[in-house]
Amino acid sequence: MESEIFDYFRASNMISKKAIHIPPFIVMDVMEKAAEMERKGENIIHLEVGEPDFDTPACVKEAAIKAFRDGKTHYTHSLGLIELREAICEHYFEKYNVKISPDQVLVTSGSSPAMLLLFSALLNPGDEIILPNPSYSCYSKLIEFVDGKPVWVGVSEEDGFQYLPEKIVEKITKRTKGIIFNSPSNPTGNILSAERMREIAGLGPLIISDEIYHGLVYKDREHTILEFTDMAFVFNGFSKLYAMTGWRLGYTIVPDEFIRPLQKIHQNFFISANAFVQWAGIAALKETKEEVAKMKEIYNERRKFMISRLREIGFGITVEPTGAFYVLANAGKFSGDSYRLAFDILENAKVGVTPGIDFGSNGEGYIRFSYANSLENISEAMDRIADYLEI
């Protein structure tokens, strides 16, 4: 009897089906493999992860230290500090001329929890979210984790990786709860035009706009979905623009009627975001204009250099990315298996890159390169890849 009980309680029987079946985040597998190689003495250049190589601006660190020393280390309101929520509203008004209330803002420990909260509040089993293929890997996994259904709309290199309203409308059903997009996009670096965003906003279902790369645009300008509709959800945060990935601070902006359901889930799952980090977020919004402009200038220099070198090596780039800090390059000349190619490049050229398959089936045959690294390291990485591919 004891043996039967022991067998039943083996880990293989106790782990939930959701935990068993959730796919890995491949870019993290690449990064962790690279870290393992580094521990063995290998010199790896990281172009796989979307993490700024810049240090967090000094004023942000100073604000966090001051808050910490002032004893601001306790729970905050579950929606977040009112001072931070007001600063977020001011930011959206100054940049986009849209008016939102602090009562529509929920501050979270990074934008990923905001996604989990929204999908948990929005989706019943079998409800659908339409999303571009390729797109950020975790969207579909979070949707499926709460028993929703991701419905893919293919975007292609031939169309400049644009999310086309005429293709989206074909996927709308009675179960469609929302349409999600990310502009500037991860992994493509493309930007949706105001006209296209307006068309998508008019399609009917709720719109979910991931605006985490706003501010990192090198031509034209980005738009918030809130310029075109009030019935939209926004994800945003501090990781990318302000070089604060390790701080874990994000937020979501939602229509009035949705804030209480999200707040209740947040209270139960997370209670509140870190208090002194929220004070640092206020400084990021109000005091980093010069630092952000300098980082953006450097990113743009790297962007142009990387595009040029990748083309020389033989990677295809039909439309130049003009936002975020990624280049999604066609690797068809070298391999149709992006997963194998990415790990071959890591093993042989000692450069971390992300396989396009991590972002959906339409990403297969592509490699995503991040230029969130120094120009010197990017140059060395391009040389290593060219040598490995015998260019």
Task: Enumerate the language-model features and the residues they cover.
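Glycine-centered small-residue hotspots that permit tight backbone geometry or close packing
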Residues: 50, 70-71, 80, 189
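Conserved N-terminal alpha-helix of the aminotransferase class I/II PLP-enzyme fold
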Residues: 75-108
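Glycine-rich phosphate-binding segment of PLP-dependent enzymes
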Residues: 56-76, 89
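PLP-dependent class I/II
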Residues: 2-15, 21-25, 30, 37-43, ...
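Short helix-loop boundary/capping segments at the starts of domains
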Residues: 36-39, 43, 66-74, 94
